[in-house]
Amino acid sequence: IEPSKYPILASNSNPMERMWAEGTWLRAYLAHGCYWHRCGFCDTSLDYVCSYKRVYVEKLHKGLYEQGKKLGVAGVHLVDEAAPPVALKDFALLNLKESKPLSFWGNIRFEKSFNRDLADFLAHGGLTGVSGGIEIACGIGLDSICKGIDIDTIVSACAAFKEAGILTHAYMIYGYWLETEQILVDSMETLRQLFQEGLLDSAFWHKFVLTKHSTVFKEYLSGKHPELNPLALDGSIIPQNKPFNLQENFAG
């Protein structure tokens, strides 16, 4: 593929969203799977989520750098479920040793590991943007989805990235089965404040959809969450503690 032959059909004033729409990227991941893999809404029973294993960063960087020179592409999109902070640091360190370093961005978790020192180092090493799931931006909401981080940690990580000049995007969820109107309002207010304080460049709201590979659905089939009442394709409620053909009756 010759990227220069494909024109940009539309432009976007949001710099974070322009990465998706207008950039040309080499794609790779620093780790297979997610090192957390416990979020209630996520497909945690699938191999690409639950089987976590880091790649050899040295080989990955060398391969991407050589491929980039051949194609004339200097940007890398790290398509991890959540790029490990240590692997990002290793990648940035290798990148700094090159005369013409790559630029890279990818998906992360807003962990406490991402302090200002690490964010500055990653930015110096070529990191230009991060995207990460906040999902439900209040304490009760984060606990309900087993996110494993709290609001203070999210705010600190976002601040570190933005102060280092790294573009920052958040994924949000609405309609989670345990979410009340007040939890949704609180989540929206937190997001508003994050934008107001300049800690986010963009965000996107996703409607919660229950999938057959999620932790919540697995728990439902074992007898938990009787109030969940998920629907099969024919509109009937999927039974608990009974034989059920997921392949035929449940999408997702």
Predicted regions mapped to residue ranges:
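Acidic, low-complexity intrinsically disordered segments
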Residues: 1-55
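Structured core elements
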Residues: 7-10, 26-29, 38-43, 75-78, ...
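Hydrophobic alpha-helical scaffolding
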Residues: 20, 29-32, 46, 50-57, ...
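Acidic/polar loop patches that form or flank catalytic/metal-binding clefts of enzymes
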Residues: 52, 74-76, 103, 168-169, ...
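Conserved SAM/AdoMet-binding glycine-rich loop
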Residues: 61-167, 174-176
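Catalytic cores of alpha/beta
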Residues: 117-119, 177-194
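Hydrophobic, well-ordered secondary-structure elements that form the walls
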Residues: 132, 170, 191, 203
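Flexible glycine/acidic-rich beta-alpha junction loops that bind and position SAM and/or redox cofactors
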Residues: 140-145, 174-182, 198-252
